[in-house]
Amino acid sequence: MPSLPAPPAPRLLLGLLLLGSRPASGTGPEPPALPIRSEKEPLPVRGAAGCSFGGKVYALDETWHPDLGEPFGVMRCVLCACEAPQWARRGRGPGRVSCKNIKPQCPTLACRQPRQLPGHCCQTCPQERSNLDPQPAGLVFEYPRDPEHRSYSDRGEPGVGERTRADGHTDFVALLTGPRSQAVARARVSLLRSSLRFSVSYQRLDRPSRVRFTDPTGNILFEHPATPTQDGLVCGVWRAVPRLSVRLLRAEQLRVALVTSTHPSGEVWGPLIWQGALAAETFSAILTLEDPLQRGVGGIALLTLSDTEDSLHFLLLFRGLLGGLAQAPLKLQILHQGQLLRELQANTSAQEPGFAEVLPSLTDQEMDWLELGELQMVLEKAGGPELRISGYITTRQSCDVLQSVLCGADALIPVQTGAAGSASFILLGNGSLIYQVQVVGTGSEVVAMTLETKPQRKNQRTVLCHMAGLQPGGHMAVGMCSGLGARGAHMLLQNELFLNVGTKDFPDGELRGHVTALCYSGHSARYDRLPVPLAGALVLPPVRSQAAGHAWLSLDTHCHLHYEVLLAGLGGSEQGTVTAHLLGPPGMPGPQRLLKGFYGSEAQGVVKDLEPVLLRHLAQGTASLLITTKSSPRGELRGQVHIASQCEAGGLRLASEGVQMPLAPNGEAATSPMLPAGPGPEAPVPAKHGSPGRPRDPNTCFFEGQQRPHGARWAPNYDPLCSLCICQRRTVICDPVVCPPPSCPHPVQALDQCCPVCPEKQRSRDLPSLPNLEPGEGCYFDGDRSWRAAGTRWHPVVPPFGLIKCAVCTCKGATGEVHCEKVQCPRLACAQPVRANPTDCCKQCPVGSGTNAKLGDPMQADGPRGCRFAGQWFPENQSWHPSVPPFGEMSCITCRCGAGVPHCERDDCSPPLSCGSGKESRCCSHCTAQRSSETRTLPELEKEAEHS
């Protein structure tokens, strides 16, 4: 059947305008509830795949049932899909949402009394309740998908990643070779939610230009620029993977290729296959040809140590070694500096080009050589060395980050001091471990820092490395552990080690953290700067918290803030209510930006319209990251943030000529070089057309001879007092300031104000500047990010909609609250009301029509107040079933007008019926009295015969 248009988002669909008051203190308020809200979703990325619907992002080919929110819930009989437009490249570009009514596809039932089961669109017969037949595709109930939305989260229909984890197939590997190259590469990918994180290591290959994913026929599904982070390692993320590509991955039909300048179609390639050995892999090897004349032959090995003995288990995959033979014996040798240590025989076939084996009982010397990367693996056909591949065994290369958050809750004897620690590690190919540890908030001197295993018994700990102490007068420890051994490196990569910090007051440990690998996410700040430690001792006043955390923050070339927060030690009561705020110095009034409210211990995201004041604080090192919980709403953890940039100038960051920006693993320019400070936060970027070397944001606006970044607001030169302009994606929108009627009979017109004010409010403006005001003497309005004097009334400006004349906000000086209300338009009796001015909120009857408003302003009326719902007026105490286009009347929802506010709720149906048969009403089932055919009327018998 033809697709119906996508239903609108719940707020616009229902027309419910949530009004209320929220505190607006000087340290930064929550945004007030406005009749129209600014867009919360991130701006769509050019070329990004997927669809945005109802505040969520869906991958191409993904289907879902739309959720209209309470009290309507999930529309079970409506199926939406994210479809790729015909003109777009396969798997790329924004999709198109198409929704259709699937109720006509329900099968015809033979029973007389079908039932509507919860979570289903189609009715079923009572006797089928225990053995339901499969419904048509799309008719089974699905919870709304919500894998990334955490307000970027963990409820609803399982996302792609959750379904994959349930199947046990999240990690895949590929051996990459080429018929015209001696190069060999190995690709490892992990499917996490709807993103594919990949790392590619290679040998004997010139610098690759791109990593390419294709289907079996060679169609390009995704490409990523290849920027190696170190010798022979490329990292990347494929976000919003289409479902078709996920199916290809699960079916082992997705292929990976490395593209070079000499081989634009791909120099080496291979299919991704699932291997259970990937979960335990801690060592690896890439085997290349020793004969310089051969091509297209190579192999990879996945190795791990046994948990109970010094035995090396491995899986070896190879290609081209059999030389066209269906089956051949192979010989595997383990060498050290050319001397043979071990030798194995194996039989393989062309259908299974690989085998698994065990090297039992490694000696202590062999374990040392394994740690140092000096063991060589050689594979050749038995009976002749004409084809021979070899490579050295090293610790597994990865794009993940080894890190640890140290907190008092994880100490061997938990303590609650407010101290915190943060550690970052780098594992080298020879087994050495470089560490950087930050410790803040301890009440006494740090006396010991050790890397150790989990204690098997009380006071029985195995220490692998004694770390250097803190630098004099600081809170940083930097050094290298060179004696971990092969077993220690194996345990490190298996997330089995802990970092313990002992102090004079707590010699056994005041802080302790689990060393874990953080999956690669594309966040460049992990690799070019240390994380910011978050501690309760840094909160003002200090909080003796047993939790801790650290965070990475960075500004990209468009001055967008990227952040990633990790926490540890939060108790069960705080787990569900955690928020992260970015603000200025503690105790000073100013904007406070909510980064994210989240559940669990980690959060990440991007802020694209950070306030200039906060950008300036970031550049000066006076910005703070504040973590609040349910038990500590004023702050549980805090850390000081410093990001050197020119973003406080209100424009783009411009790199100085001759300065080479270091590259992060994802290929983006890092932000570590210190750049000179720019002009003040309100200064625009002068327009210099044609100047080479200066990157320009395609969303920048050019107005009055100056460039303004996307989201910038300013007063234009032609009317600096009574106009406000905003840049919205290369478009400048200027609105006149509309003054609300003053509440006093004799207002005063100030020279520096556009709107007249009452005399007593004018006197409040004569006080010292607003930044010095106490929180109760003014309000900070997050809509246009400005301070308002007590008693001020104004029409709000909400990006990207601009001036909202249908709402009036008031600053309540006594409480510091911003209270916004929708303008109540009178009910008109004329048939054709008109809007006198395009900017007016309310319509009015035409002049000379001889009709007046039937009702005055409901907010000021003496009689009962009515309710306006979905464009209609309902009298006080009236009940009705709302109508939702294009689905019609919602018979299971009842709305009622009370005190001028509509209240809607779903009808409460009784528990499942115990009677044998029932009667189906518009929403709920109820039992009916059974009557014999003698007592039933003739029309009832005729109707029953028709249904039978």
Curated annotation (Swiss-Prot):
Residues in VWFC domain copies: 49-126, 699-759, 779-845, 867-927
Q: Does the keyword Repeat apply?
A: yes
- Which SMART domains does UniProt cross-reference here? CHRD, VWC
Where do glycans attach?
A: 347, 430, 877
Q: Does the keyword Repeat apply?
A: yes
What Pfam families does UniProt report for this protein, alphabetically? Answer: CHRD (PF07452), VWC (PF00093)
Which parts of the sequence are annotated with region: Disordered?
A: 143-165, 665-697
Q: Which InterPro entries match?
A: Chordin, Chordin-like_regulators, CHRD, VWF_dom
Q: Give the UniProt entry's GO cellular component terms.
A: cell surface; extracellular region; extracellular space; presynapse
The post-translation modification note in this UniProt entry reads: Cleaved by tolloid proteases; cleavage participates in dorsoventral patterning during early development.
State the Gene Ontology BP annotations.
Answer: artery morphogenesis; BMP signaling pathway; cell population proliferation; central nervous system development; chordate pharynx development; cranial skeletal system development; descending aorta development; dorsal/ventral pattern formation
Please classify the protein's predominant subcellular localization into one broad category. secreted
Q: Which GO terms describe its molecular function?
A: BMP binding; heparan sulfate proteoglycan binding; heparin binding; syndecan binding
> Domain CHRD spans what residues?
168-277, 279-398, 399-520, 526-646
Specify the signal sequence span: 1-26
Keyword annotations: Developmental protein, Glycoprotein, Repeat, Secreted, Signal
- According to its UniProt record, where is this protein located? Secreted
What function does this protein fulfil?
Answer: Dorsalizing factor. Key developmental protein that dorsalizes early vertebrate embryonic tissues by binding to ventralizing TGF-beta family bone morphogenetic proteins (BMPs) and sequestering them in latent complexes.
Subunit comment for this entry?
A: Interacts with TWSG1 and/or BMP4.
The entry sums up its family as follows: Belongs to the chordin family.
Protein name, UniProt field: Chordin
Species of provenance? Mus musculus (Mouse)
Q: What is the lineage of its organism?
A: Eukaryota, Metazoa, Chordata, Craniata, Vertebrata
Q: Give the gene symbol.
A: Chrd
